[in-house]
């Protein structure tokens, strides 16, 4: 028996559309990260970018459980002395770029390195219900029906 190793030329990428409305952030991010890496495919090869292209819409309607909506903090540093900054998940979701919550959650579930950066380029997140990828004919994936814990009605 020989271990299967897929070549980059053999990769077939599909387009997946996920509606994030009322979905739990961590559960959504886990599913998206696995789709981006290609771990759902029987032809998964760790060193090849064989994941799908994922489109997430309604990112501003994602749900955080518990007190994370008000208490979870995202930190960054400006580079200056004493330049540590923070924002809560609520400030980001109600701000100009609510899609960054999903991007950051998925980014932290993808391996760091050149392959991880290439896989992150296959993720498109939009705050509203409109997206410019109709020509790719994305296949809708209903994450809420996969597991009852994936969806929260607020």
Curated annotation (Swiss-Prot):
A family per Pfam: Ribosomal_L13
Cross-referenced CDD domains: Ribosomal_L13 (cd00392)
InterPro entries documented for this protein: Ribosomal_uL13, Ribosomal_uL13_bac-type, Ribosomal_uL13_sf
Annotated signal peptide: none
Region annotation Disordered: where it falls in the sequence: 129-154
One biological process term in Gene Ontology: negative regulation of translation
Superkingdom of origin: Bacteria
Keywords: Ribonucleoprotein, Ribosomal protein
Annotated GO CC locations: cytosolic large ribosomal subunit
Quaternary assembly: Part of the 50S ribosomal subunit.
Record-stated family: Belongs to the universal ribosomal protein uL13 family.
Stated role: This protein is one of the early assembly proteins of the 50S ribosomal subunit, although it is not seen to bind rRNA by itself. It is important during the early stages of 50S assembly.
Entry protein name: Large ribosomal subunit protein uL13
Lineage, highest ranks first: Bacteria, Pseudomonadati, Pseudomonadota, Alphaproteobacteria, Hyphomicrobiales
């Amino acid at each position: 028996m020989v271990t299967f190793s897929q070549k980059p030329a053999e990769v077939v990428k599909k387009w997946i559309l996920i509606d994030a409305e009322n979905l739990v952030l961590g559960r959504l991010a886990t599913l998206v990260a696995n789709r981006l890496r290609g771990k759902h495919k029987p032809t998964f090869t760790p060193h090849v970018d064989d994941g799908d292209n994922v489109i997430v819409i309604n990112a501003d309607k994602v749900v955080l459980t518990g007190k994370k909506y008000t208490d979870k903090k995202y930190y960054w540093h400006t580079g200056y002395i004493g330049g540590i900054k923070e924002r809560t998940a609520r400030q980001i979701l109600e701000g100009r770029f609510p899609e960054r919550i999903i991007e950051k959650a998925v980014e932290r579930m993808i391996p760091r390195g050149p392959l991880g950066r290439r896989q992150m380029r296959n993720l498109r997140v939009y705050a509203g219900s409109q997206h410019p990828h109709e020509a790719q004919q994305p296949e809708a994936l209903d994450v809420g029906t996969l597991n009852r814990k994936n969806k929260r009605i607020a």
